Amino acid sequence: MRINPTTSDPEVSIREKKNLGRIAQIIGPVLDVAFPPGKMPNIYNALVVKGRDTLGQEINVTCEVQQLLGNNRVRAVAMSATEGLKRGMDVVDMGKPLSVPVGGATLGRIFNVLGEPVDNLGPVDTRTTSPIHKSAPAFIQLDTKLSIFETGIKVVDLLAPYRRGGKIGLFGGAGVGKTVLIMELINNIAKAHGGVSVFGGVGERTREGNDLYMEMKESGVINEQNLAESKVALVYGQMNEPPGARMRVGLTALTMAEYFRDVNEQDVLLFIDNIFRFVQAGSEVSALLGRMPSAVGYQPTLSTEMGTLQERITSTKKGSITSIQAVYVPADDLTDPAPATTFAHLDATTVLSRGLAAKGIYPAVDPLDSTSTMLQPRIVGEEHYDTAQQVKQTLQRYKELQDIIAILGLDELSEEDRLTVARARKIERFLSQPFFVAEVFTGSPGKYVGLAETIRGFKLILSGEFDSLPEQAFYLVGNIDEATAKATNLEMESKLKK
C-alpha cells in the first residue's frame, strides 16, 4: 500500500522526514532545485513546493524530476502553474514517483494528473494508490492469443474488429458522433464483458471534457446517485494546463486502468483523447529541458515516449486493456512524425465519415476506410472474412457507380449493377444501429448485436433473400429479424393508408 503525496501527512511532519532542497532557477514550468550533497532525488521522483506568494495565497506545486544536472542540482517539470514561486523556496523530495488513487473509488469521478478529484464531490479514498511510472508487463505475463473484442456494434465487429488488448485509432472531425460512439463502447463493455473504462482527456478543450461528463451523467454511464455503479473514471489534463500535466495525464489514466486489469482481473477500455496532444506536450517539455529537436521540431525521444506508454496497454493472463485513441492528424499529413509513430502501434482504425453522418446513418463509421489487422481468415474464420469482403466489394462497387447514377440515373445501369446498388443501400442502412446511450435523444431502444447475428444478417442480404424488402426496413435496427419485422409493419402501414 502506498500513500499519495498529494494527500499525505501534514507539511511539518513531511519536512521532518523528507529530503529538503531549494529552488535555484525557474524557467516557465521548469525548475532547477539544489539539494544537499549526497541527497539527490531519483529521476521521476515527485517534488513538492509549499508556501505562500507575495499576496499571501497558498502555493502547492508538485513537480517531477527529469534530469540530474550535476553540482547537486536537478531539473524538474511542474504539474501545475508556477506563478508565485521564487528562488530560495523550500522543495520537499517525496522519495517516490507521483502516485494516484486506484480501484473502485475512482469510478464516476474526475481527476487531474496528480489523482486529485476536481469534480467538487468531496475527497476520494486514497488508501490504495499506485505510482504512474511502471515497466510494461513481462513477456511471460502476456496473453498472446489473438481474440476479437466483441463490441456489439455491427459495423465495427464485422468490418474492422477490435483485438482484445489491442489499440485502435479513432479518426473523425467535430460533430460526426465520436463522443456517442465512445459512450456506447463504455456502456457495452460494462454490460457484455463486466468491464470498466477509463477516459484520459489529454490536452483537449475543457468545454468538450465538461460536455462529455454531462452526457455521461444523462445517459447513465455515470450514476450520480451511486457513484460505485458508474462504469467509467475520468482523468483530465486539458489544453490550458502546463505541458508537464498534459504529458503525464495519459500515464495517470493508464495506471488506473492497470489496477482494474491486474488486481480486479477485468477487461478494461482505455480512451485517450487525444494521443497527438501527448506527443505535443512531450515536445514542449523536451525543448524546455534543452534537448536538441528532431524531425519537424519533435523531441528526439518521440519513439521511446510513445513506446513506453503503448507497451503498457496490453492483454495479460489476468485481464486486458483495450485502448481507443483519438488521433489528430496535423494539416492532414499522415507522414508527420507524431501520427506516423502512433500508426506503428495500432491494430485497427475506425474512421468516422461526415458524409454518412449527413445521411443520418449512425454510427457514422466509414466501412471502406476503417481497417483492422484482425480481419484475416485464420483469426476470424472463413465465414466472417468472406462476408466482410463481400460487403466491402458491394459497397465499393456502389461507390464507383455513384457518379454514373448522378449523371444518367439508375435506369441506365445494367440489371446486375442495379441489384448491386439496391443491396449496397440495404447494407449501408443495416450498418446503422440504435445505441443505448442515445435512447434519451432518439426514443429508440438500444441494441447489442452479437457477432454471429451480425454475420448471419449480412449473409442473408448478400444472398438476395431480402431483395424484395424496402431499404427503410434495414435502417436503425438490431439484428436481421428486426428488419424483417419492420418490413412487415411498413407494409401494413402502407396498406392502411390506402
From Swiss-Prot:
Gene from which this protein is expressed: atpB
Function: Produces ATP from ADP in the presence of a proton gradient across the membrane. The catalytic sites are hosted primarily by the beta subunits.
Modified residues (Phosphoserine): S13
Binding site for ATP: G172, G173, A174, G175, V176, G177, K178, T179
Record keyword Magnesium present: no
Protein family membership: Belongs to the ATPase alpha/beta chains family.
Gene3D superfamilies, A to Z: 2.40.10.170, Bovine Mitochondrial F1-atpase, Atp Synthase Beta Chain, Chain D, domain 3 (1.10.1140.10), P-loop containing nucleotide triphosphate hydrolases (3.40.50.300)
SMART domains: AAA
GO molecular function annotations of the record: ATP binding; ATP hydrolysis activity; proton-transporting ATP synthase activity, rotational mechanism
Catalytic activity as recorded in UniProt: ATP + H2O + 4 H(+)(in) = ADP + phosphate + 5 H(+)(out)
Keyword Mitochondrion on entry: no
Protein name: ATP synthase subunit beta, chloroplastic
UniProt organism field: Capsella bursa-pastoris (Shepherd's purse)
Enzyme class: translocase
